[in-house]
């Protein structure tokens, strides 16, 4: 884990020595860039200890997703109405975070783009925190270039207010106290943009429905050009957003498979196994 002045790091002798070490099988962690003790800025800072640990662990990682980069969206998004109120949903982020943990355990490098949750971060995941759908869309676009597998678990708000009031909207502002009209505009479709990007990562969606579960999931699979979709009934309190259990039906373009009720962590492991199998078969 080299650490030195940026001029020393850039010296040809240093670079030649590093090349010699690499050719002998020595792995270098870093250096990173930033402000140095001498006051200069550039490459030469030792990586943070957590980053060294993560990179070192990756060297010894094996598993069904070893060598892959998985990007997962998780949790809800919030669309502000005024400084006090917002539009959101009941998503807890539990299934998305469980999938991140399962992917890490399968050997993948994992990035999570997460809406607001109260969950502990999965160890060794790179986390990007957002609030609104536009923020999540932008974060995904920035991260997608080297992603092998994208799993869109987040319960994204489809619409947002056209304008956000700078002050709290008072009840007295409603004409004759008969309520107010909230004008909405459609948000960008995150998973469709990923599924139609070039190069396209293996793209997995979620369909959280309350009726016609399989029919609506199949429509989404086709319309958004997905490789897989996981359908679940969020109207069932036993397996809904805040439950620790889940029951799903997984759909591919040519088949379906029902997964019985189990913990969300066990469900995540099973989904990761099926994703890995499908990716391998596609290759």
Describe the role of every protein-language-model region:
Residues 18, 84, 96, 100, ...:
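Generic hydrophobic/aromatic pocket-lining and core-packing "Φ" positions
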Residues 88-106, 169-191, 225-231, 258-261, ...:
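Gly/Ser/Thr-rich active-site loops/lids in small-molecule metabolic enzymes
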Residues 14-15, 19-20, 64-132:
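Glycine-rich phosphate/diphosphate-binding loop of Rossmann-like nucleotide-binding domains
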Residues 1-2, 71-75, 113, 152-154, ...:
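Short beta-strand segments
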Residues 1-35, 41-56, 196-228:
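Short, glycine-/small-residue-rich phosphate/pyrophosphate-handling segment
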Residues 33-69, 87-88, 235-283:
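Glycine-rich phosphate/pyrophosphate-binding loop and the adjoining helix
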Residues 131-234, 238:
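Glycine-rich phosphate-binding loop
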């Amino acid at each position: 884990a080299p650490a030195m002045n940026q001029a020393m790091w850039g010296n040809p002798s240093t670079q030649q020595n590093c090349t010699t070490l690499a050719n002998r099988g020595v792995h270098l962690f870093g250096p990173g860039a930033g402000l140095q003790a001498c006051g200069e800025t550039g490459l030469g800072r030792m990586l943070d200890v957590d980053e060294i640990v993560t990179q070192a662990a990756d060297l010894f990682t094996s598993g069904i997703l070893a060598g892959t980069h998985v990007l997962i969206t998780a949790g809800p998004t919030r669309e502000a109405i005024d400084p006090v109120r917002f539009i959101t949903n009941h998503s807890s982020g539990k299934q998305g975070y469980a999938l991140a943990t399962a992917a890490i355990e399968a050997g993948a490098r994992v990035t999570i783009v997460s809406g607001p949750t109260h969950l502990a971060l999965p160890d060794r995941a790179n986390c990007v925190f957002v609030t609104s759908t536009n923020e999540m869309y932008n974060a995904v676009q920035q991260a997608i270039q080297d992603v092998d597998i994208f799993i869109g678990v987040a319960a994204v708000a489809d619409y947002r207010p056209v304008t956000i009031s700078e002050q709290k909207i008072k009840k007295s502002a409603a004409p004759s106290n008969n309520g107010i009209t909230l004008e909405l505009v459609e948000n960008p479709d995150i998973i469709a943009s990923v599924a139609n990007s070039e190069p396209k990562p293996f793209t997995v969606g979620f369909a959280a429905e309350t009726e016609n579960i399989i029919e609506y999931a199949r429509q989404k699979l086709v319309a958004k050009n997905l490789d897989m979709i996981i359908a679940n009934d969020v109207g069932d309190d036993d397996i809904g957003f805040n439950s620790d259990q889940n029951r799903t039906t997984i759909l591919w373009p040519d088949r379906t498979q029902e997964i019985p009720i189990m913990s969300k962590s066990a469900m995540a492991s099973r989904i990761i196994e099926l994703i890995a199998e499908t990716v391998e078969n596609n290759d």
